[in-house]
């Protein structure tokens, strides 16, 4: 048992050292302005590549991801219903859906779902 822990520790140490050395050796010495500028078919760019991004799009994306993960978690619950205690499954499902509804209400209350503002 001790030899397995020793070998695992040795492998972990070697991997850590290799990753550290790789990160040091792969860093660029200096940043070239031409290489970091946007490329538009050899022409100078018409505008800055760092345009401000609307926070509304970001928030809608986050809300979509949350509810997308919700669907990924709810679908297996339907299959698990056959194999588990119905009371535990019902309680878990109700708590899960209540947490999501409270989150949706909070987003609505904060005005995140109101696109007109």
Swiss-Prot record:
Note the Pfam families from the entry: Oxidored_q4
Q: Which GO terms describe its cellular component?
A: mitochondrial membrane; NADH dehydrogenase complex
- Reaction(s) this enzyme catalyzes, per UniProt: a ubiquinone + NADH + 5 H(+)(in) = a ubiquinol + NAD(+) + 4 H(+)(out)
Q: What is its main location?
A: mitochondrion
Q: Which UniProt keywords apply?
A: Electron transport, Membrane, Mitochondrion, NAD, Respiratory chain, Translocase, Transmembrane, Transmembrane helix, Transport, Ubiquinone
EC numbers: 7.1.1.2
Transmembrane regions listed in the UniProt entry: 4-24, 60-80, 86-106
Class of this enzyme:
translocase
Localization, per the record, is:
Mitochondrion membrane
A GO MF annotation of the entry reads: NADH dehydrogenase (ubiquinone) activity
How this chain sits in the membrane, per its record, is: Multi-pass membrane protein
Role = Core subunit of the mitochondrial membrane respiratory chain NADH dehydrogenase (Complex I) that is believed to belong to the minimal assembly required for catalysis. Complex I functions in the transfer of electrons from NADH to the respiratory chain. The immediate electron acceptor for the enzyme is believed to be ubiquinone.
Q: What family is reported?
A: Belongs to the complex I subunit 3 family.
Q: What is this protein called?
A: NADH-ubiquinone oxidoreductase chain 3
Q: Which gene encodes it?
A: mt:ND3
